[in-house]
Amino acid sequence: GNAVPIVQTGSKGIYLGYMKIHLDKVGKQRFSYRLIPVDSRLDSRIDPAFASKLGYYSEQLKKSMNEVLGYCPSALRKGSPQGTLGNWAADSMVEMCEDVFGVTPDLAICNNGGLRAEIPKGDVTRSDIYAVFPFDNKMTLLELTGTSLLKFFDSMAVNTEPLSAGVRLVIKDGAVKSVSVGGKAIDPKAKYKICTIDYLVESGRYSLDENTSRQDS
């Protein structure tokens, strides 16, 4: 078939790509391109009226994002198989699940890939929290059978994700040797409530889509 050019301007929506492709009669081609920062104009002029209006909202946003929400006594870091940041995030999800759904889950699961920044020691601002959690994920409450939950933990031997307190997982030689929730071995016939995010349920990487019930925030 015909060759189709596929181009990309990078990531995070920083640039707009502009490309010219020149074709002559014998099929030879040449091209030129440039990257245009999305915060600039083609003619480099700044509209004073728009800049004034944007400045007002920028100041309001800055005030909100710089608001101190809490204090972190020690830095929260990512880690594998477990890190303090991921464990804190998963434990926080347990508390949030109680507020949002009125249910205390048996465990909470988040994903390392979704934690995009670490939290240093000191004051924690709203901006810090958005840096850690930049995605618009929904909190999801699932009910899984013990059999499906065991399948999930089997996959954790390869792709470890942060878990809430109360989960003990022993992995050796790439395989799960033992797992317990709340100090008890998992009963394959029992049902467990898991708090997670919609992304992990729909990613297809785990058995979370085998849930018997689901609620989204």
Briefly describe each language-model feature range.
Residues Q8-K12, Q82-T84, Y130:
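Short Gly/Pro-enriched turn/cap motifs at secondary-structure boundaries
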Residues P37-V124:
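Hard-cation-handling environments
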Residues G1-S64, M156, T160-L163, V170-V179:
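Active-site-adjacent helix-turn-beta-strand microarchitecture at beta-sheet edges
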Residues A3-V4, Y15, N87-S217:
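Feature captures C-terminal
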